C-alpha cells in the first residue's frame, strides 16, 4: 500500500512539474509576442503608414471571424464587432485603439493607448477626421484581405458616406508591416530555429531510431 501511495505521489509530482513547465513556456511565449508587438507598433507602424500615405488603419473583427492580422494585433474576444484602429496624429508614434475587443488580453499586452466600445467608432473617427482610411481588402495578398463584405457594409453604415469615399486598400501597408522585422522578432526566429534543430536531431538519432528495426509507421 505504501509503495502504491509513493508511486501515485511521484506520478502526481511529475504531472504538476510538467504542467508548471508548460505554463512557464506559455508565459514566456506570451511575453515574447507582446515585446515583438510593442516594438513593431513603435518602430515599424509609423514608418509604413507614412510611406503608404495612410492616416488611419482600421481592422474589423466579428464574432467567429477573425482577421488574419488579429494575432499580430493582440487577439481578444469580440462579441459582435470589434475594431483595431491605428491613427497617425502627426506625432512620433501612432495612436493605437481597441474598440469592442474583450479587454483582458488587450490590457495585458500593454500595446494600446485607448480601449473602448465598438459603439464609439463613429465619434472616434469623426474626432480625428482622417483623409485616407486603410481597410484590409486586397487583390493579391490573402493575409491582407480579411475584411468580409458584411463587415465592410457594417463599417460603411457606422462611418457614413463621407468616410466611405476615403477608403483605400491596406494590401501594401499590411505586407510592409508584417515583412519588416524588429530585433525581438529576429531573436524569436533564431530561438524557433534552434528548437526545430533540436527536435530534428533527436528524431533522427539512435535514441529514437533503431537501425534495421524502426519503420516509417513508427
Question: Language-model segments: what does each one mean?
Answer:
Residues 1-3:
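N-terminal secretory signal peptides that target proteins for export/translocation
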Residues 5-6, 167:
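A residue-level detector for conformationally permissive "hinge/kink" positions
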Residues 6-16:
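Bacterial N-terminal signal peptides
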Residues 166, 211-212:
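Charged- and aromatic-enriched interaction segments used to assemble
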Residues 21-206:
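A composition/biophysics-driven feature that prefers long, compositionally simple stretches
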Amino acid at each position: 500500500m505504501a509503495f502504491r501511495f509513493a508511486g501515485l505521489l511521484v506520478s502526481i509530482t511529475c504531472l504538476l512539474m510538467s504542467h508548471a513547465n508548460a505554463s512557464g513556456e506559455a508565459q514566456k511565449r506570451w511575453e515574447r509576442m507582446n515585446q515583438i508587438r510593442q516594438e513593431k507598433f513603435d518602430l515599424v507602424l509609423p514608418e509604413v503608414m507614412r510611406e503608404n500615405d495612410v492616416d488611419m488603419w482600421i481592422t474589423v473583427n466579428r464574432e467567429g471571424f477573425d482577421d488574419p492580422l488579429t494575432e499580430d494585433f493582440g487577439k481578444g474576444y469580440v462579441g459582435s464587432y470589434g475594431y483595431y484602429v491605428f491613427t497617425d496624429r502627426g506625432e512620433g508614434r501612432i495612436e493605437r485603439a481597441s474598440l469592442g475587443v474583450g479587454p483582458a488580453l488587450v490590457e495585458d499586452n500593454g500595446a494600446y493607448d485607448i480601449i473602448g466600445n465598438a459603439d464609439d467608432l463613429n465619434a472616434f473617427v469623426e474626432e480625428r477626421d482622417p483623409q485616407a482610411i486603410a481597410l484590409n481588402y486586397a487583390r493579391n495578398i490573402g493575409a491582407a484581405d480579411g475584411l468580409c463584405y458584411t463587415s465592410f457594409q457594417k463599417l460603411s453604415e457606422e462611418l457614413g458616406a463621407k468616410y466611405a469615399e476615403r477608403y483605400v486598400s491596406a494590401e501594401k501597408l499590411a505586407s510592409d508591416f508584417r515583412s519588416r522585422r524588429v530585433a525581438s522578432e529576429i531573436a524569436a526566429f533564431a530561438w524557433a530555429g534552434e528548437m526545430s534543430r533540436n527536435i530534428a536531431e533527436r528524431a533522427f538519432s539512435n535514441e529514437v531510431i533503431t537501425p534495421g528495426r524502426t519503420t516509417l509507421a513508427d
